[in-house]
Amino acid sequence: MNNDNEVTNLRDVLKEGKICLCPVKGIINVLSKKWTLLIIVVIGNHGTIRFNKIMKQFEAINPKILTDRLKELEKENLVIRKAFAEVPLRVEYSLSNDGKELIDAIIPLMEWATKKDAKK
């Protein structure tokens, strides 16, 4: 949304109840958890990536938190988990088609946040 008219129109549509916010609430509950958006971006940037490589992208993430977030993203069909029958077990993560669509929606948010942070 690049102009004020589009923002006003969206507000009017929301006020009139023409858009159900129920699906939005569900995805917001998942995406608002700490690390989730960043995990999606890291997977999107790499295409296919293993757990330990995701861990290395973040300084302070707990392995259990990363595991939980990846399971939630898989449950929401945003991430695909592929396990290989090898010893040791090898697991790779990639974005599903829905996850790739979500990246397209996240990019403007990240650009906005970067621009806002640069003003500080």
Predicted segments with their positions:
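Membrane-interacting alpha-helical segments
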Residues: 1-10, 57-68, 119
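Short, solvent-exposed amphipathic helices
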Residues: 101-117
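Canonical helix-turn-helix DNA-binding module
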Residues: 52-84, 88
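N-terminal leader segment of winged-helix/HTH proteins
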Residues: 1-31
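Basic, amphipathic "hinge/linker" alpha-helix immediately C-terminal to the N-terminal HTH DNA-binding motif
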Residues: 85-106
